[in-house]
């Protein structure tokens, strides 16, 4: 591996870059596009460095992101590698290290969810979480492409096999069964209501089911049900009968996926400049679910090239699980190199296929169908959003010639001045930018003073952040005046368009009035696409702010009554809530039960009981 940095003495940027490219080798390697200050804008890999880098400067480049990247390039550095596989691995390592802005291929790079069964306790716990937690010993099952799929599996396992889900701390402190036992989702091993042997059977059945081996469970449950009935232990017989009934119901739903196998099935499609990739996850012969991605790629490029870029980003940056097979809708131009790089990165062999038959062909057809449907829906939403932005531009034509691309909207939420939260949501012409959403906890104001809250939020945000093209305030002239005051103090007035959206006559939805600083209020018809856009953004700001407020309020209310008790610190408060499962259960506890909690004792228990029941 050789580092090459070609710096030309030529001053003119265009000529200098052309001179630089001419001197690049026709060898595999990695290239780094550098900005004016030496910052890394983009990292890529190539079979031939000279050909790949030269392609960025072709006159036929149409993708706006690529054109924007090329306009910012001031220098190019390359690293020669021994093979294309080595280049691919190095590319992904550099992307992880530097996070270049133009390498953002996948917006949603959360790690996938796994169902986990612990192995370091006599009564193992069933749980789920993102990624494989290295320090935890046990069995991981997945990945599940959505939180819904993981939670649904967890609930199903609870109903069928009744394993505990509580934390180890909560488990150790129990003196009586919790609510999960009452609703038949746990057999209460914490208080000895199930033997270690019986619980171990439930654990083994859960593991077998998650591995896709439910036929053995079916036979074993029939045997146990019949044996319990012969021994006149009808309670156990009913328990096994219920498990058997639920298992049959699940098997009937999943009969189409009874073939064994672990695979990721990936299909790509493109239409009108938009690209969609569907990843279908198959584990133990069962489809666990699918997830759609809309990577920011140049849709004019061949689908196979974009699929190759997606796959390397997906397996190196998003998931930490490599199945035995990857089935693709298109054959990759660098399929061998990708396969070798994945095998090297994960330490296990993977087979990449495009020509598949029988059930694998059905999986691939399913992925293609999901891709096309998701693309159609997303494209429809995008075109509608684009039309709404266009309508807004027309409505504001007499007020501003500013291009409206980024819109930020603020809302204040509280309950009679309690737990005041300011919420900020962000939209552009591609939709909501959830990663840019922010919530602000409001301090040091008179409770219920919305003007003071809005002033604090706007000041805190725009002291550090640049202004959007349009700043939307949920409120009328009063809130708009506060926004004007803040921007004046920050020396930013005039750098953005300020609009206040207030409910019109009778405060009815659809009769909103737009307020401006230097223009008369504007009433838009109820069918106005511009009004629909602003109402949608305003409603999203309200939803975001009120959700954050309720969460903060409920958390404060659940702990505030305990905070006034002398001698009850944060750890003891947490222990009490964990032990009884919440404030309501704590209120129903006797003084003796309170004293039984570790660290409380009879004296403190008396004080706690007295305060809670005054």
Curated annotation (Swiss-Prot):
Residues 26-104 form the GIY-YIG domain. Coiled coil: none annotated. The keyword DNA damage applies. It holds the Pfam family UVR. InterPro entries: DisA/LigA_HHH (IPR041663), GIY-YIG_endonuc (IPR000305), GIY-YIG_endonuc_sf (IPR035901), GIY-YIG_UvrC_Cho (IPR047296), RuvA_2-like (IPR010994), UVR_dom (IPR001943), UVR_dom_sf (IPR036876), UvrABC_protein_C (IPR050066). PROSITE patterns: GIY_YIG, UVR, UVRC. One of its GO terms (molecular function) is DNA binding. GO terms for cellular component: cytoplasm; excinuclease repair complex. HAMAP family: UvrC. Interacts with UvrB in an incision complex. This is UvrABC system protein C. The gene is uvrC.
